[in-house]
């Protein structure tokens, strides 16, 4: 890693120096400490210390497309510049979350676009900002999904992603997604989570308390009993062709950055990392801004 990586992370010497044990360090020593220890320790190092700080980076004056807002849109849904997209209609979403006490049904947003087959050609608008919170991990084919988002992004537009860090959420025990997983999904042209993805999602989860995960209290899973309990039901459901939602990918900031960089080098996407904000202590998400570039750029 180099100074350019510090710029990618939006590193601030002044912010990082506020820690008592770092106050007397030089700029060079701060940079070394951040790269060696600070990222792993989840220290605050810049202007983004939480979700609100990240959202506040967004210029909301232009057209905005929010992916999967469910019942918690991050922007004014009444604005004429606001659009949303989901793989389910509002009615389907209400039905899907009927027994979930954490979802306020009356607040579920009516999607401007309902697209479950990766065909974004129906979208004629071009957006200055695309915002997606905890959706990228659901996308059956990361390459196709990123290209779809790029296809409706204005030339100087930006894609803002809030992504769960698999180390600190209920995905802790699942294998980290690598570039080979991503390329295989692209080769298979997956348009919905595979049966295996759904089974793993339901049977390999643990608790979702980020503080406990940061303290290395990861809980345990009982995959066998859950698998036996759900297998037949899921198989019957999957055979009907219905879209069964699941986490398909499991990222860390480092793995996601490497995947995006490799996909761009392979000329499979025309997006690059503009900024990346590492997971901070007590949180289970990191933030990424993607920008559009020429495929040979």
Ranges and model annotations:
Residues 103-120, 144, 148, 158-294:
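S-adenosyl-L-methionine-dependent methyltransferase catalytic module, highlighting the catalytic core
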Residues 24, 129-140, 246-250, 277:
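Short, charged/polar micro-motifs that form catalytic or ligand-binding hotspots
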Residues 47-59:
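Class I SAM-dependent methyltransferase Rossmann-like catalytic core
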Residues 62-172, 288-294:
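Conserved SAM-binding loop
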Residues 1-50:
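Charge-rich, low-complexity intrinsically disordered regions
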Residues 56-59, 122, 268:
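Structural motif
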